Amino acid sequence: GYLVQGLGVKQLPADSILLWVVTFVAYGCLYYWKHRFGHQWRIMWASHSAHHQSEEYNLSTALRQTSTDYIGFIFYLPLYLAGVPTEVIISVGSLNLIYQFWVHTEHVRRIGFLEWVLVTPSNHRVHHARNPEYVDKNYGGFFIIWDRIFGTFKDEETDRPCVYGVTNQLGSFNPLWANLYVWYDTFLISLKTKR
C-alpha cells in the first residue's frame, strides 16, 4: 500500500466484478511463475521444499507450509502497480490457497474435461511426485492452463504411479529441520564455492 501510494498509483475500484475476474486470472499467472521459480531458484526452493518433503499425499500435505517465504510477494508487485486494491489481491490469493488445499488428495482420480483447465488432484499429484518424468511439472495453483501454455504440463500416467517426496529425502520428521535444512545445505554449498 505505502509503496503504491508513494508512486502515485491510482487505485482501481474494488467493487468492480471485472476487476475481480481479471485479478483472479492475473494472480493465477503470477502464482504460476512464483511457484515455478520456487522450484528452480535454490533460495526460493529453500522456502518451499518443506511442502514437498512428505512421502504421503493427503490433505495434511497442503498444511505443510513454509515459515521462511520472505520474497514471494515480489511476484505480485505488478498487481499493486496496476492499481489493484490490496484487499482484492489478498482475497484472490486466499481463494487460490483454499482451492489448493482440496487438490492434495488421492481419493479423487480424474474429473473429465476439467483436467484441461483447472488444477485437479490428478494434476497436482504429478507436481508432488519425485518420479523423474514428473519432476518440475504442473506449477499452476487454480488454472492448469499456464502449464499447458508454458510447456510444464504433464499428465498423470496410470502405468506410472506417483512416488511422493523430494529427490533427496530429508530423513527427519522434525518440522524445524524441515524448514531449515535446505537453507543450511545452501550455506554449506556457498562455503565450498570458489571465490
Task: List the model feature ranges, each with a label.
Residues 1-21:
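Juxtamembrane/interfacial segments at transmembrane-helix boundaries in multi-pass membrane proteins
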Residues 14-169:
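Membrane-embedded catalytic scaffold of the fatty acid hydroxylase/desaturase
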Residues 160-195:
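A membrane-cytosol interface segment of integral membrane proteins
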